[in-house]
Structures are given as C-alpha cells and as structure tokens.
Regions:
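A conserved catalytic-core segment of Leloir-type glycosyltransferases
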Residues: 22-95
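Donor nucleotide-sugar binding/catalytic pocket of nucleotide-sugar-dependent glycosyltransferases
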Residues: 130, 143-221, 225-231, 235
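Conserved donor-binding/catalytic core segment of Leloir-type glycosyltransferases
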Residues: 229-248, 254-258
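N-terminal subdomain of nucleotide-sugar transferases
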Residues: 1-45, 91, 116-118, 255-260, ...
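Short N-terminal targeting/anchoring amphipathic segment
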Residues: 85-106, 119-126
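Alpha-helical "lid/cap" subdomains adjacent to substrate-binding clefts that gate access
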Residues: 48-72, 125, 129-169
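A short helix->loop->beta-strand "cap" motif at the edges of active sites that frequently abuts
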Residues: 116-121, 178-180, 201-202, 269-271
Length: 273
C-alpha cells in the first residue's frame, strides 16, 4: 500500500497485517510512506526518489491537461514507481496482496513485474481505479464497461486521449495477469468490477473492511452519552478524509437529513451531526 496509516485503504491494509500477525502468520507490509517504528512495515525507495515518482506522475497529468490543476488528483496513470520484486521481503513471500498503490508506489510496469514473478496475487480494490483507465470513481460514466476514451476528467478529451492510452496498457497488463484474485470491499464495487472490460474475467470476492472489536464495541447508550459528554439528541456520525469530495456522498447525507425533518421523523432541534 502507498501509505502505512493515512487513508482508508492504508488503515484497512494495516489492520489486516496486524490480524494476520496475531494469528501467527509471517507478514510484511511494503509502503511508500512509513509512519511507525514497526519492523513489519518496510519503506520502499529513498525520500528523493519518492518525491520524483510522485511529481513525475502529476507532471504528466498536468501537461496533458494543458497546465490546468483541475482534476489533478482525481486521476492516476501509474507511469512511475518502484520495482519491489527485488526486495528480500517480496522474494520470501508466498502470496502478494496489493491494496492502494497509486501516487508513485507502483507503475503499470512494476505491477507487470509482480505478475511475472509467478507468485499468486490478491488485489483488494478500495475504489474503481483498477477497473477504469485513470479515474478512481467513474461517477455516471459507463465507458469503463466498453473502452475508456473521451474522459470527462481531462480538459481536452478525445478518442486517443490519455485515458484511452492508459486503458490499452491496462488491458494488455490484465490479459496476462494470472493467477490474480480480486477482492472488493463492497457488493457495489464488486458489481462495477464484474461489468468492467478490464477485470470482468477475473474471480471476484467481496470482503468488507472490518473494525476491531477491541476499539469499537457496543456500550450502554446512556452511559456512553455521559462519559463522552454527548448531547441528548439523535446523533448522526459521518466521517471522510475530505467531505468536499463528491464521492464521499455528503450531499446524499444532507438530503436524507432534510427528508427526515420534512417527514417529521426527527425534530430538527433534536438532530446532531
């Protein structure tokens, strides 16, 4: 995974690593950005190399968009990264488990090197990037079901735009990827994968992200309110890295709250977000 702790994919990957370790499995986590002193977590590359891979990918996207910053981080093209197959941790591994590997962690060529190693690969998808050309969420676009081109996230889309060129590279990459097992973290994501041209021939399993029962557990509601100094209201909890990101769905949450108020399910003064 690109990061050890930052972001939902990183948290999910690290929880899995810790659970496997507790169960007695020898597991290592390769990351671009290490954020702890754990000996199980191994950083890839030097600091200057990491900056170069990150900047080079963004530079290519920026120039293809004629120097517009719009959607600069909405897409990823995996044109640069690190060859992890030479690392001792990789060579010693029986199974390779990929998570979120964008922003300079692995290039498409690096992923091909992993496939060509002959080791069985599990890839957990935390968004749609693997089954589209360059976007992490297709929104209403359905071109990933046929062939990505005329990309809505590019300033000047066309039949042979950046999205189409990356799509063709991915198509070639995944056509020779065996054995590859895909994991989706939700049934919705699984349905998108099974409709995509790139991955619909691959086996897909749904394994939702889990929560630690030690950190998250049921408690008496009134006691919890008292201990946490929570107001005596209907509390709705919403969390996201950025609530201004449309794919996080905050607008749907607000619509739902309005409906609850309009239908008098909850009085407005008794709601706490």
């Amino acid at each position: 995974n690109t990061s050890e702790k930052t972001g939902g994919a990183a948290i999910a990957a690290r929880r899995l690593m810790e659970s496997l370790h507790t169960a007695g499995t020898d597991v290592k986590m390769l990351v671009l950005h290490k954020e702890s002193q754990s000996e199980q977590v191994i950083p890839v590359g030097k600091d200057w190399q990491k900056k170069c891979t990150f900047l080079w990918e963004r530079l290519v996207i920026w120039t293809n968009n004629l120097f517009s910053r719009k959607n600069l981080f909405t897409v990823s093209i995996a044109n640069t990264g690190f060859n992890v197959t030479k690392l001792p941790a990789f060579r010693e591994a029986d199974i390779i488990h990929l998570h979120w590997i964008n922003q300079g962690m692995l290039s498409l060529n690096n992923i091909q090197e992993i496939f060509e190693s002959g080791k069985p690969v599990v890839w957990t998808l935390h968004d749609m990037w693997e089954c589209t050309a360059i976007c992490h969420h297709a929104h209403t676009c359905t071109l990933f079901k046929s062939e990505c081109r005329n990309c809505r996230f590019l300033r000047f889309p066309g039949n042979n735009d950046l999205a189409h060129r990356v799509f063709k590279k991915k198509q070639k990459l995944f056509s020779h990827a065996s054995p590859l097992n895909i994991v989706a973290v939700s049934t919705w994501l699984s349905s998108q994968i099974q409709q995509s041209t790139l991955l619909k021939e691959k086996p897909v399993s749904v394994i939702p992200n889990t929560l630690s029962p030690t950190d998250f557990r049921m408690m008496d509601k009134e006691l919890s309110r008292k201990e946490l100094s929570l107001p005596d209201k209907h509390i709705i909890l919403f969390g996201a890295a950025r609530i201004d990101d449309p794919i996080k769905g905050v607008e749907y949450l607000l619509q739902a709250i309005r409906l609850l108020i309009e239908k008098k399910q909850f009085p407005q003064e008794k709601l706490h977000l």
